[in-house]
Amino acid sequence: MPDYEFSPASGDRPRSWISKQVLIVLGVCLPVILALAIWVGVLTWRQSSMGATDHVSAIVLGRCLTYTRNMHPELRNQDCKKILNTFTSAFVSKDPCNITKEDYQPLIDLVTQTVPCNKTLFWSRSKELAHQYSGIQKEMFTLEDTLLGYIADNLVWCGDPRTSEVKEEFCPYRNENCSSTATSVFWTVVSQKFAESACGTVYVMLNGSRTTAFSKASTFGSVEVFNLHPDRVHTLHAWVMHDIGGVERDSCLGSSIKELKSIVNQRNISFFCQDDYRPARFVQCVRHPEHPSCSVLM
């Protein structure tokens, strides 16, 4: 058999040189790939989380003192430090996705406040206007005008099984894998209590600039309306408000309001609806005095 010897063809490189090139490329690219993977992981985690409010405990205590000492001195006997401790005990050192209504029950039992009959105002997708209205009509109470609603409004909080402190970083979003967050369960519990305590004629402010003014997926549609007691509440007035200059997508004649009326009537509660309730419309027109729809009111 002939003894052939193959030499590298023109342009070929020895295998050792190619191995060195591969190592150099890996040395340059691998850190970039790892950094990208970490960044994607962090981004995914942040997308499933929301920023916890810094210094939640201090804010809750401060708001409680402001509310009971200045805004509603008739509640001066409420122990704000005890309220804070009971509030945080509901979720600290616990799985942030597995909070229960029972966790907040001691807080509900502790805070006693009576909203006068005929002064309860619910809202759905109209928070800003409802608060502006109740801010002028001081005798009206939205949930956030009560002590428990006031101390927690616009805050985000949660705990961690690994620590006894309130978490100051990120809290999980409420989703199908985390449906019982500390914040969402709190609002469900206090919303239920707010509705159960209502009496006489109650009111709800709805947003007719949305496709559906009433939604059974909202807190009002899923919790509050079903916890109105017919032996305490005899009438529900709905105010369907529309944005100044906006599109009127729903009204008292719409299908969603008919659904609300059916739910309320089945609970033996009378129902009335009014589009663009005049006193609330005046509040809207403060910011748009020159708009034709506001000029008509003057």
From Swiss-Prot:
<feature type="topological domain" description="Cytoplasmic">
    <location>
        <begin position="1"/>
        <end position="21"/>
    </location>
</feature>
<keyword id="KW-0472">Membrane</keyword>
<comment type="subunit">
    <text>Homodimer.</text>
</comment>
<dbReference type="GO" id="GO:0005886">
    <property type="term" value="C:plasma membrane"/>
</dbReference>
<feature type="active site">
    <location>
        <position position="117"/>
    </location>
</feature>
<keyword id="KW-0325">Glycoprotein</keyword>
<dbReference type="GO" id="GO:0005789">
    <property type="term" value="C:endoplasmic reticulum membrane"/>
</dbReference>
<keyword id="KW-0520">NAD</keyword>
<dbReference type="GO" id="GO:0043231">
    <property type="term" value="C:intracellular membrane-bounded organelle"/>
</dbReference>
<feature type="transmembrane region" description="Helical; Signal-anchor for type II membrane protein">
    <location>
        <begin position="22"/>
        <end position="42"/>
    </location>
</feature>
<feature type="glycosylation site" description="N-linked (GlcNAc...) asparagine">
    <location>
        <position position="98"/>
    </location>
</feature>
<dbReference type="Pfam" id="PF02267">
    <property type="entry name" value="Rib_hydrolayse"/>
</dbReference>
<feature type="disulfide bond">
    <location>
        <begin position="285"/>
        <end position="294"/>
    </location>
</feature>
<feature type="disulfide bond">
    <location>
        <begin position="64"/>
        <end position="80"/>
    </location>
</feature>
<keyword id="KW-0735">Signal-anchor</keyword>
<keyword id="KW-1003">Cell membrane</keyword>
<dbReference type="GO" id="GO:0061809">
    <property type="term" value="F:NAD+ nucleosidase activity, cyclic ADP-ribose generating"/>
</dbReference>
<comment type="similarity">
    <text>Belongs to the ADP-ribosyl cyclase family.</text>
</comment>
<feature type="disulfide bond">
    <location>
        <begin position="252"/>
        <end position="273"/>
    </location>
</feature>
<keyword id="KW-1015">Disulfide bond</keyword>
<dbReference type="GO" id="GO:0016740">
    <property type="term" value="F:transferase activity"/>
</dbReference>
<dbReference type="GO" id="GO:0035556">
    <property type="term" value="P:intracellular signal transduction"/>
</dbReference>
<dbReference type="InterPro" id="IPR003193">
    <property type="entry name" value="ADP-ribosyl_cyclase"/>
</dbReference>
<feature type="glycosylation site" description="N-linked (GlcNAc...) asparagine">
    <location>
        <position position="118"/>
    </location>
</feature>
<feature type="glycosylation site" description="N-linked (GlcNAc...) asparagine">
    <location>
        <position position="207"/>
    </location>
</feature>
<feature type="glycosylation site" description="N-linked (GlcNAc...) asparagine">
    <location>
        <position position="177"/>
    </location>
</feature>
<feature type="topological domain" description="Extracellular">
    <location>
        <begin position="43"/>
        <end position="298"/>
    </location>
</feature>
<feature type="glycosylation site" description="N-linked (GlcNAc...) asparagine">
    <location>
        <position position="268"/>
    </location>
</feature>
<comment type="function">
    <text>Synthesizes cyclic ADP-ribose (cADPR), a second messenger for glucose-induced insulin secretion. Synthesizes the Ca(2+) mobilizer nicotinate-adenine dinucleotide phosphate, NAADP(+), from 2'-phospho-cADPR and nicotinic acid, as well as from NADP(+) and nicotinic acid. Also has cADPR hydrolase activity.</text>
</comment>
<dbReference type="GO" id="GO:0016849">
    <property type="term" value="F:phosphorus-oxygen lyase activity"/>
</dbReference>
<keyword id="KW-0812">Transmembrane</keyword>
<keyword id="KW-0492">Microsome</keyword>
<keyword id="KW-0521">NADP</keyword>
<feature type="disulfide bond">
    <location>
        <begin position="97"/>
        <end position="178"/>
    </location>
</feature>
<keyword id="KW-0256">Endoplasmic reticulum</keyword>
<dbReference type="GO" id="GO:0030890">
    <property type="term" value="P:positive regulation of B cell proliferation"/>
</dbReference>
<keyword id="KW-0808">Transferase</keyword>
<feature type="active site">
    <location>
        <position position="199"/>
    </location>
</feature>
<keyword id="KW-1133">Transmembrane helix</keyword>
<feature type="disulfide bond">
    <location>
        <begin position="158"/>
        <end position="171"/>
    </location>
</feature>
<protein>
    <recommendedName>
        <fullName>ADP-ribosyl cyclase/cyclic ADP-ribose hydrolase 1</fullName>
        <ecNumber>3.2.2.-</ecNumber>
        <ecNumber>3.2.2.6</ecNumber>
        <ecNumber>2.4.99.20</ecNumber>
    </recommendedName>
</protein>
<keyword id="KW-0378">Hydrolase</keyword>
